[in-house]
Amino acid sequence: MYFSELLADISGIVAFPSADTLITAPVSENAQAVQPGGVFLARKGANIDGHDLIPEVINNGAAAVVGEYPPGLVDCTVPYAQVEDGMAVLGPLAAAYYGFPSRKLTVIGVTGTDG
């Protein structure tokens, strides 16, 4: 899957990357868990700003980065997409990477009034 395909159904994207790349590993917000060919989601946390870890994840093989800061404010040499809210797009990005598995499920509900 290409980065542009991963982002296609995601709302809240402020700036799309100018380049595309092949994504061969999952999305992660944990810099230590990013796999070569994967996507790093950089967001500002309570104690650590994930944007500061972008050079490290790129050195470890990240193919692309999604972050909350404007592209001009981050040190990123791979395709970068800016989003409004990193936490809000984490689930949809993971679902997109895995081909939206919940769309293939049939949900059946059973309800009752006693008990």
Each language-model region and where it sits:
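N-terminal leader/targeting and accessory segments in enzymes
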Residues: 1-92, 96
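Walker A (P-loop) phosphate-binding motif
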Residues: 95-115
